[in-house]
Curated annotation (Swiss-Prot):
Superkingdom, taxonomy of origin: Bacteria
Record-given protein name: ATP-dependent protease subunit HslV
Lineage, highest ranks first: Bacteria, Pseudomonadati, Pseudomonadota, Betaproteobacteria, Nitrosomonadales
Species the sequence originates in: Thiobacillus denitrificans (strain ATCC 25259 / T1)
Keywords: Allosteric enzyme, Cytoplasm, Hydrolase, Metal-binding, Protease, Sodium, Stress response, Threonine protease
Enzyme class: hydrolase
Catalytic residues in the record: 7
GO biological process: proteolysis involved in protein catabolic process
């Protein structure tokens, strides 16, 4: 049985500000099932941003598990991610899940892989999903060559990825944790 999949999730960090966004397309094989899915969530008292790529049902299971870890560890992102990864490696059900998470708080950006690995990406850019490499390339160029804020970099990079990747679209949801306490969300 085919799974729902295909997406672009991107997180960009500059200074004390981080933006995490994703497109809204869900595909089943080569058919677009939904174009306005929300793959980005705020967790733990709105202090943690999380986005998923991969099987939709699998990703929601991981969201629930990750949120439980955040609650258990008082919102400590690194510890919660490592504890989820430990569970992922030892729990038979979790090992079969086909999804990845990109998560961020005001201090760290992480990728939690389908193998149960926790990676802190270089340059403050985390990208997952079928359009992730396209978005990451665009974000890196913009981060290194402009003074754009993370929100603008994520917007432009997701647009570029959506133009290239057939499993991504131009319906974006972007959440921001800001250094001035201006946390916000954007839906385009």
């Amino acid at each position: 049985m085919e799974q729902y999949r295909g997406t672009t999730i991107l997180s960009v960090r500059r200074g004390a500000e981080v933006a995490l966004g994703g497109d809204g397309q869900v595909t089943l094989g080569n058919i677009v099932i939904k174009s306005t899915a929300r793959k980005i969530r705020r967790l733990y008292q709105e202090k943690v941003l999380a986005g998923f790529a991969g099987g939709t049902a699998d990703a929601f299971t991981l969201f629930e598990r990750f949120e439980a870890k955040l609650d258990k560890h008082s919102g400590h992102l690194l510890r919660s991610a490592v504890e989820l990864a430990k569970d992922w490696r030892t729990d038979r059900m979790l090992r079969r899940l086909e999804a990845m998470l990109a998560v961020a708080d005001r201090e760290h950006s992480l990728i939690i892989t389908g193998n149960g690995d926790v990676l802190e990406p270089e340059l403050g850019i985390a990208a997952i999903g079928s359009g992730g490499a396209f978005a990451q390339s665009a974000a890196r160029a913009l981060l290194e060559n402009t003074d754009l804020a993370p929100l603008e970099i994520v917007k432009k990079s997701l647009t570029i990825a959506g133009d290239i990747c057939i499993y991504s679209n131009q319906n974006h949801v972007i959440e921001v944790l800001g250094d001035r306490g201006q946390d916000s969300g954007v839906r385009e």
